[in-house]
Amino acid sequence: ATTELLNQPLIVFIDDTTQWNPQNHDGSTGLLTTLREGLRRSLNLISVRVVQELIEPKDIVQNAKDFGMTTYIRAVDAIALGVSEVYPLEITAAYGTIANNGIYSRPLAITRIEDRHGRIIKEFIPESKEVQDEATVYILRDMMKSVVDAGTGGALRWKYKFRAPAAGKTGTTNSKADAW
């Protein structure tokens, strides 16, 4: 959370031959910026530097698998900016893992089947496993709270008056076709 990276222009490799010069959503640059501040402000340049300087793309892919992702995710620098798509249910389960202190629970659509008298015919129990240690997830979740409380997700608080505890990560696709 306190690690600092340079908030300056860089080159991202999308594949072996394609390069891209990403920008922060507001076009800003800066000096050394903490990971917490980069996440709070949704700074693309900081996200890419995490991949280029701290964590290899292949390790991010493995973490994604541990958090329940089954879709193909390309192990390239641009992974930091969402170069690969994932199923909404899988990303929801991944966020659930963060909320659940690092315990991943496989999503279930049906938890039990009852007859017309309420007797249980079949019960389904979600598969759960620890995929990340609680201390690491605590730091991540705390950083994500700053997105909602004082960052790019702040409209949840000031515009919609949502007061319950919340954590999040904002982002948009190119041309703002999707916004999460």
Tell where the protein language model's regions lie, with residue ranges.
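Secondary-structure transition/capping motifs at alpha-helix termini
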Residues: 1-3, 70-72, 100-105
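Conserved catalytic neighborhood of penicillin-recognizing serine enzymes
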Residues: 2-60, 104, 116-146
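Soluble periplasmic/extracytoplasmic beta-strand elements of cell-envelope proteins
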Residues: 4-6, 80, 112
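Mid-domain, small-residue-enriched loop/turn segments at the edges of structured enzyme/sensor domains
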Residues: 17-24, 54-93, 107-109
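Short catalytic-loop micro-motif centered on adjacent basic/acidic residues
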Residues: 47, 80, 167
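A penicillin-recognizing enzyme superfamily signal
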Residues: 87-180
